[in-house]
């Protein structure tokens, strides 16, 4: 059993155990659509060259979301084992490719089941906002009045209006609302942490 040491380290450990030159990396809540599966088979038959990315389509509380900044959400998930590694912190992980690695785009969607209920979304926001606040504190960031008051409002308008989240119906509204709440919480918690450090 490998000791948990964060998402990036865990994925790099799994990559090191892979027996083949190319890796397809999927999370537990993801699956390949039939179209994407066919695209991958075609690419394999033609011979792998570089890395491969594809659109990720997210299911939010039972509805597929195509707006609000959540789609196409391109992810690079097929890559040469020797030319890629995961980097990042305990909040996010990012795939880093060697310079010059070509990224090809495949047709079809990577299906992603993210939040199964509004309470699930709220619970994760509470948890991740704490991690974000601690990270911002370590980076020396501040949480002034303008940031705490206006950033959540801008986040809502950005997702619901400018990125057309309203076209996803109630799902789009709740995504924009909880995205704004996530911003409000992380700045509120950062403000509290800063106050505690001054005390």
Predicted regions: what is each one?
Residues 28:
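Walker B catalytic motif
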Residues 2-7:
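Short, acidic/turn-prone active-site loops that include or flank metal/cofactor-
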Residues 9-16, 21, 33-197:
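Catalytic-site signature of metal-activated, phosphate-bearing donor transferases
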